[in-house]
Amino acid sequence: MAGAGGWDPLVGSEIHGFLTYPDLNYEKLVAEAAARWFRPNEIYAILANHARFKIHAQPVDKPVSGTVVLYDRKVVRNFRKDGHNWKKKKDGRTVQEAHEKLKIGNEERVHVYYARGEDDPNFFRRCYWLLDKDLERIVLVHYRQTAEENAMAPPNPEPEVADVPTVNLIHYTSPLTSADSTSGHTELSLPEEINSHGGISASSETGNHDSSLEEFWANLLESSIKNDPKVVTSACGGSFVSSQQINNGPKNSGNIVNTSMASNAIPALNVVSETYATNHGLNQVNANHFGALKHQGDQTQSLLASDVDSQSDQFISSSVKSPMDGNTSIPNEVPARQNSLGLWKYLDDDSPGLGDNPSSVPQSFCPVTNERLLEINEISPEWAYSTETTKVVVIGNFYEQYKHLAGSAMFGVFGEQCVAGDIVQTGVYRFMVGPHTPGKVDFYLTLDGKTPISEICSFTYHVMHGSSLEARLPPSEDDYKRTNLKMQMRLARLLFATNKKKIAPKLLVEGTKVANLMSALPEKEWMDLWNILSDPEGTYVPVTESLLELVLRNRLQEWLVEMVMEGHKSTGRDDLGQGAIHLCSFLGYTWAIRLFSLSGFSLDFRDSSGWTALHWAAYHGRERMVATLLSAGANPSLVTDPTPESPAGLTAADLAARQGYDGLAAYLAEKGLTAHFEAMSLSKDTEQSPSKTRLTKLQSEKFEHLSEQELCLKESLAAYRNAADAASNIQAALRERTLKLQTKAIQLANPEIEASEIVAAMKIQHAFRNYNRKKAMRAAARIQSHFRTWKMRRNFINMRRQVIRIQAAYRGHQVRRQYRKVIWSVGIVEKAILRWRKKRKGLRGIASGMPVVMTVDAEAEPASTAEEDFFQAGRQQAEDRFNRSVVRVQALFRSYKAQQEYRRMKIAHEEAKIEFSEGQLGAACRS
């Protein structure tokens, strides 16, 4: 598989962090596929850019270790049939697969399924696909043969293991090998090296850490040896032995420790900090797993000097009792949990989830404390680009009593990202900070990846200008203010542009009436502004905004009167295609809606893209503006002009849903359906008037004693009933209209007698469909009302089972009893009457007649539907919109936040209705 367009930017780079194809280096990943599992961001990059790679059309037969294959799940549904024998569930038929969702950053983005070989337990398969609905059809299958042995060793460890205090620092991870999805039981396999980098193997690099390791242990144990030469007590907690003892061990020891270490070992090295002592499940390795850990003698030093570049490697420290303690047993039950990479960690619930971090963090070599051990003097730089790796240098000094920790391994926590640091010199640490979500995060230094030992500073991730991520970020406060100012300038330019025109006397009278309806600005608003300015402690920024708004309001009144006097039917648009009402809707000027309504201009005036003021308000989530527009009579069922992305156009509810305003979208969808049905009723497209519909009206007195959550749920249920009833009535009206048109077309295209028969058949079919539909609705309502409790449903099921059995037994009895009589009677009729007396062929000679089927003339059909093509397309689009609207309302039940937004929108609409009614009443009194 090869990539195309190597230097073109990759899709989803802001998520996985690879900007171009060379950054991903897919060829290297394939080469490493047999040695390690892919990371979640690498998997996301491959699946999101699957067009660059080969998609297999058939399952691969018996793939070997290191095979990576891409399939289209919709095309190759049997991609799991690869010829291998995988471990089955208890039924012996279904493959036993465990699954989980992997996180990239803070969000779950990848779904993974694990399977383990039946014949070869060391052979694994992982299937990945994305949680994104648009990309979930592509699956990546990774096969890998691990180097592990059977982890389920005999429970009795060798005697010399219990006699020697040891350093149980085991560098291992394990995939989730098998899990029974039914019972929830998980079988754990403890491989020698399975991780996202392929683990650590014994090599010549092990010896490079000897000198630094000796210095490390010497510094830690020096003070303790002076105090007690027999018992070494470390200030940092954990179990330690000297590097000399480690180096003296045989190179190919089958166990973690051996008898050769016993003679040189310090008698007591079982040192556990208070925090670790209270967590009995922390840092303890199951004794049953010791048999699987082979050839660890060569790797001990390399395991102690942690491979900080590995993403999922982890150290698990075990405390083993020495002979002096009188206890050589190791707990057999160790709490295990799994991180997002499918790796099992033997830690307690309070230990940090290090497997989720981009870099692995070793277990703590210091006491867990909230006390500050170190003071940060300088951080350079204090920011980084969110899509690049940046080198950050931190300078700090340990306090006097903690100087002995200056040589310890240091980690920096940047938000949720833990990064291992390099010691440049004493007090100077270098960190390589990877990509991160833009924004400010907390930064502190730590020795264990969790507990801060320094003050918490601020670190900022910036967006690189010109990157694809910059366009997807939400606008900042400065951008929001700048956009508002631009809209205000456009509105002012549109209102203050003068176009003198001769006014007819009739229009002058009309303009005078409109001017009388619009009251002048109340003096109280000017006085409020003056009082704010008189306050010496007040701020002038909101006063400036209020002053500009009052000026625009006064000018808008004059401008609308001028438009009426000049005889304009609409208010016109500016150079960018928006009118004054659209700009006011964007800015949230609710007072402008009443002025437009009084002046007689349409509230559904469209801009150059077919957007109304309600579309703009819904798109920007302005609930007060939406409520004011709806109370003034704006139509929520209108759609925008079609675009290549949405050929059928978008409603205001669709626009609100696209921006994440689910509650607002549900409210607009409900109002759009009811408004459409009311419009059809007024135009007599349906026989059912709005007053006869079953649209639910909430009675406030019924819900006085309900909590807010219960009220939100009640109103959501009522909204769903309203939307479903309105959609059902609209579709029924459309079917009635279609039947009328088809009847008229058939009557014109066929003779009178034939046409009447066809029309009668069509009416019968239509009535039968309606009857079935109503019957199903009644049955559904009856089921809902009768089976709300478990007891009633259980009784119904038992009764139905008994009735079916009785009916079956009775029918069988009746058939068996009458069978011989029927056969004898038919034989007599055939032989005696038909064949002998009538001299005919009998029943066997009667040809089975073909059923008469009513057909419609094929030549007349195009004539009846030719002019309906665009109507049919429009109706299909309308039905899709209705279904979408019902789904939007139904989505309220998945989010309490959306229910709150819906309730808030409903209350705002009711208040806006009252305010608009009072304004209309005042205008009528003035006129």
UniProtKB/Swiss-Prot annotation:
Superkingdom assignment: Eukaryota
Domain IQ span(s) in chain numbering: 757-786, 799-828, 882-911
Start and end residues of each stretch annotated as Necessary and sufficient for nuclear localization: 70-96, 830-851
Any one GO cellular component localisation term in the record: nucleus
Cited function: Transcription activator that binds calmodulin in a calcium-dependent manner in vitro. Binds to the DNA consensus sequence 5'-T[AC]CG[CT]GT[GT][GT][GT][GT]T[GT]CG-3'.
Name recorded for this polypeptide: Calmodulin-binding transcription activator CBT
One record GO biological process: regulation of transcription by RNA polymerase II
Inhibition and activation profile: Transcriptional activation activity is strongly reduced by calmodulin.
Keywords: Activator, ANK repeat, Calcium, Calmodulin-binding, DNA-binding, Nucleus, Repeat, Transcription, Transcription regulation
PROSITE patterns per UniProt: ANK_REP_REGION, ANK_REPEAT, CG_1, IQ
Outcome recorded upon mutating W836R: Abolishes calmodulin binding
Origin species: Oryza sativa subsp. japonica (Rice)
Residue stretches of each ANK repeat: 609-638
Region (Calmodulin-binding): 826-845
SUPFAM superfamilies listed in its UniProt record: Ankyrin repeat (SSF48403), E set domains (SSF81296), P-loop containing nucleoside triphosphate hydrolases (SSF52540)
Residue ranges: DNA binding: 26-152
Pfam families linked to this entry: Ank_2, CG-1, IQ
Gene3D superfamilies, per database record: 1.20.5.190, Ankyrin repeat-containing domain (1.25.40.20), Immunoglobulins (2.60.40.10)
Motif Nuclear localization signal, chain ranges: 72-79
Molecular function terms from GO: calmodulin binding; double-stranded DNA binding; sequence-specific DNA binding; transcription coregulator activity
Family (UniProt): Belongs to the CAMTA family.
Cited InterPro entries: Ankyrin_rpt, Ankyrin_rpt-contain_sf, CG-1_dom, Ig-like_fold, Ig_E-set, IQ_motif_EF-hand-BS, P-loop_NTPase
Places the protein is found: Nucleus
CDD domains: IQCD (cd23767)
